[in-house]
């Protein structure tokens, strides 16, 4: 029954400040963050590496967050994807959640909000790990 203290989290956002801030928050909580700056890079990274969760911007040039989410569901990657948006309308939130997002996060986000989401993901990860061993 191995439980993990450290999650490996991918951050996909086209804004440098968002990527760097979120990565710093994740690192500060004792987890590992890796960042890419667009959806196509996110897709390629998810093809090649395993992550425990991903924070993905809803609107990006090229492959947007919603299409990356849908692709990950089609490929059955099974990782929780949190969709982030600076234009967080109820319709956007509903679309993300109905498409299989783990959560919807409006920008600007708080450390408390990020911490709560990561703790929930970690609890779920540890529960699944415990039940499979």
Language model segments and positions:
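Two-component/phosphorelay signaling modules centered on CheY-like receiver
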Residues: 16-34
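Acidic catalytic/metal-coordinating carboxylates
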Residues: 37-41, 64-67
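Short amphipathic alpha-helix used as the core "switch/output" element in two-component signaling
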Residues: 44, 66-77
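Receiver (REC) domain active-site loop signature in two-component systems and cognate sites
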Residues: 60
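C-terminal output helix
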Residues: 91, 109-118
